[in-house]
Structures are given as C-alpha cells and as structure tokens.
C-alpha cells in the first residue's frame, strides 16, 4: 500500500477498462505530467474524453497537488449534461484517492476506474497525449529566459489549439472540436 492509503478497495468498475467510447462523456481519462524548464517545474492535469481524444478541461500548476487535479475534474463536470455519468479512469496516484477527488466523483455520479498497480498501458490514452504534446510543444525548444507564467500561458495556448485546430487522422482529418461540430455534438 502506498503512503496515501487505499480509500477504495475495488476502484475499477468491471466495464470501465476501455480506451474507446461511442459518445462523448462516456469514458474520461486523466493523469499528471511534469515539465522542467530553467525557471522551474510545471504540472499538467487534463481530463480527456476517450470518444475523440479531446482535452475537455485541464489545470496547469507549479505544484502537483490535489487542488490541481480537482480543478480539472470540476471544470469537466461543469460541462456534463443531465443524466451523464461517465467513467473517469486514472492511475493510482494520490490525487485520485484523496477524499476531495472521491467526493467530486460521488457528487457528479462519476464511476471511478483505476489502472492496475505498475501498469502504465492501462492509461495509454493519457500517455499518448503527453507524448504528442511533448514532441510538438516542449522538446527541442530553448526555454531559457522563459518565465513560469509565460510557459503556462504557452502550454494553455497549445492545449486550446490541440482541442480546436489540431487535425487528427482518426477523426477524418478534423480537430476534436470540428469533429464534434460536424456530428452536431458541439455549437
């Protein structure tokens, strides 16, 4: 057992282990990744919809704390329609076992799912997003002289671009937002 304790014995509903969804707000994934630049460290915690890989909400912080994870989850929950109770899949990190996170999940009727211990392939969609983000946005850039505030602005701008404009072949060469608009799922 980790130092954070185990607040939920069987955290994964049997039907939850999937990376695809046939409609928005069926299965979400979340994770935290770190960026190190000369000015310090920044942490990103997105909520990604497995329907189309759209980052629905995210938090960026200089501290990987529960407030960061809770903020991204609350931002996503505020967009739920009536009767929508998605599965939210995460790794077994402390953020996802704290009473605050569990309380938000309970309040919004979210079904929690957690990766098996030490099994990063269980959260492959999140790892894939981070890999793409770091290749396109982070690696190969000289971040010398960039303040943390500016870095966070640039990271946020990239995520907005990824959601609204990044063309993805698996979505018929459309961005996640355009894909939803074409299906009549977004305004």
Give, region by region, the residue ranges found by the protein language model.
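Charged DNA-binding/catalytic regions of mobile-element recombinases
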Residues: 1-187
